[in-house]
Amino acid sequence: MTIALGKFTKDEKDLFDIMDDWLRRDRFVFVGWSGLLLFPCAYFALGGWFTGTTFVTSWYTHGLASSYLEGCNFLTAAVSTPANSLAHSLLLLWGPEAQGDFTRWCQLGGLWAFVALHGALALIGFMLRQFELARSVQLRPYNAIAFSGPIAVFVSVFLIYPLGQSGWFFAPSFGVAAIFRFILFFQGFHNWTLNPFHMMGVAGVLGAALLCAIHGATVENTLFEDGDGANTFRAFNPTQAEETYSMVTANRFWSQIFGVAFSNKRWLHFFMLFVPVTGLWMSALGVVGLALNLRAYDFVSQEIRAAEDPEFETFYTKNILLNEGIRAWMAAQDQPHENLIFPEEVLPRGNAL
């Protein structure tokens, strides 16, 4: 018996090969297999958001006006979450809630579920697009890995957090002022600013901004004067083989400033990747914790002493009182279906009052 080893070649292309050739063809806008997920989902998510902010009211879900048609502007318009009574319903247009009635579906908050789902899939499609292109041109996949940070934050905030609560109602609505309201809600009900995962997220994002500013300024400061152009952009050939700036000079400069400096470009750029992505992932993990109602840092001894001693108060105890005020105000305003009424004597008062 003879076994022949070799590369198998097909005589003619099948449907998959034809599709692969067309999708991955070199064109102005790359499509790829990832584009089958990215482009339709991005189109539907953006289209749903523009439709909702232009025409759809939030009167039936939040008791609010939220569209341009009702007088809102870009900062106050939003696609609002479904009512709390709908819990975690997928709110399909053909489902038992809307029963195929598009107007009723919009009034119930179906557009929010539509935008959230397609938005998440579009972000995942964009990450897969970066994977696919990187593989095609034989690059490492670090762009896609970095983009996992924003995806983790989006999925944790818009999907996982409300899944841990009583319904989609407690997710952020898709609008600028609506997300500001959600941030205040997070602070009042979860003391989010004192959560260690939020602290790591802030350190990551602001640290990344600092690293970008330092890196950009350092590169500009140490450019080689190779060209005759009057500015940076005309001085160099985009296909040049030589270095654009002096890493050695930059290293000497920061060694004198801080006493330490990055010794090579690989470590420097990996650190610039690591800091923001880790910060975003930590924030996402923190939000998953909030979905389970895990608490932030509590300094109970300070709260007890502040309650017993009228002259003792810290910034922490003042913030706790502020959180109580946010809860007392937002619970009644934000959940009108609960008919909550708080008499004045139960509202929080600081020792200074």
Swiss-Prot record:
Q: Which HAMAP family match?
A: PSII_PsbD_D2 (MF_01383)
> What job does the chain carry out?
Photosystem II (PSII) is a light-driven water:plastoquinone oxidoreductase that uses light energy to abstract electrons from H(2)O, generating O(2) and a proton gradient subsequently used for ATP formation. It consists of a core antenna complex that captures photons, and an electron transfer chain that converts photonic excitation into a charge separation. The D1/D2 (PsbA/PsbD) reaction center heterodimer binds P680, the primary electron donor of PSII as well as several subsequent electron acceptors. D2 is needed for assembly of a stable PSII complex.
Question: Which reaction does this chain catalyze?
Answer: 2 a plastoquinone + 4 hnu + 2 H2O = 2 a plastoquinol + O2
Going by the record, the broad EC class of this enzyme is: oxidoreductase
Which keywords annotate this record? Acetylation, Chlorophyll, Chloroplast, Chromophore, Electron transport, Iron, Magnesium, Membrane, Metal-binding, Oxidoreductase, Phosphoprotein, Photosynthesis, Photosystem II, Plastid, Thylakoid, Transmembrane, Transmembrane helix, Transport
UniProt binding sites for pheophytin a: 130, 143
Residues that coordinate or bind a plastoquinone: 215, 262
Question: How is this protein named in the record?
Answer: Photosystem II D2 protein
Which residues does chlorophyll a ChlzD2 bind? 118
Q: Name one GO biological process term.
A: photosynthetic electron transport in photosystem II
Q: Could you confirm whether the keyword Metal-binding appears in this record?
A: yes
Principal localisation: plastid
Q: Which PANTHER family match?
A: PHOTOSYSTEM II D2 PROTEIN (PTHR33149:SF57), PHOTOSYSTEM II PROTEIN D1 (PTHR33149)
Could you list the residue ranges that cross the membrane? 41-61, 125-141, 153-166, 208-228, 279-295
Residues noted as binding chlorophyll a PD2 in the record, renumbered to the chain: 198
